[in-house]
Amino acid sequence: MKFLKKMIQVGLAVFFFGLLATSTVFADDSEGWKFVQENGRTYYKKGDLKETHWRVIDGKTYYFDHVSGEMVVGWQYIPFPSKGSTIGPYPNGVRLEGFPKSEWYYFDQNGVLQEFVGWKALEIKTKDSVGRKYGEKREDSEDKEEKRHYTNYYFNQNHSLETGWLYDQSNWYYLAKTEINGENYIGGERRAGWIYDDSTWYYLDPETGIMQTGWQYLGNKWYYLRSSGAMATGWYLDGSTWYYLDAQNGDMKTGWIYVGNTWYYLRSSGSMVTGWFQVNGKWYYAYSSGALAVNTKVGGYYVNYNGEWVQ
């Protein structure tokens, strides 16, 4: 990066070998603003003044903590300048003010904002055995073995993480939310498999993350996902055929089912039976609604309380 190239020779050696002096100065400009290292932390200062927000320096964007002034690196949850905010005439760059909300941004090890737009796979260092879990704060796994894995993220035009549902290239994706129970986490990961959102189950392709619709055979069971992606439950009419999907799990049922105080029979394909049908050598009759006829006569034939035709 440009500012590293401008470090004075002594400061460069000290920086890379970790032998930090009390104060190391580099990247000076004509107005006296400069990068300064103090006790292993980097600041942008002019005398006793510290930058404490966004700053564009030599065409690169940095963020300095709004309280301490320390240059940030890695994932940061920080405010983004509002539309129409003031851009002041600062030396060697601009300072942006007016912050309506915070978003997640990614800065490299030199503190430079990574101006990603669209999909980006980032290598993430984590401290748990399978990679950072959704909803896990970084400090939650400080004592665990460090692992690395790649995670797919989507960045908007402001270079911040998108979260929630994303429609891209005619497909829907779901990006993990960063706020859970009022607390902010590092989210934004492209989800895969089953997800539960707003009291509804959805299924995302395990490889691409694309939201699935229609009939899906998963874990040796059939499910139906509506055009919205929502998992169907209960009775479902597909064309002219009725199916029953478990009210809780959504898996397609076959054979005998008891719903609303009524018996129904579903073929091995899941389709609901109507009319006369035979099961294990016994004849039964189901009305056009699929309800099993019991203890009555159908076309002069008697069916008992179990629905079986009695000769």
Which residues does each PLM region occupy?
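Extracellular adhesion/carbohydrate-binding repeat motifs centered on closely spaced tryptophans
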Residues: K2-Q311
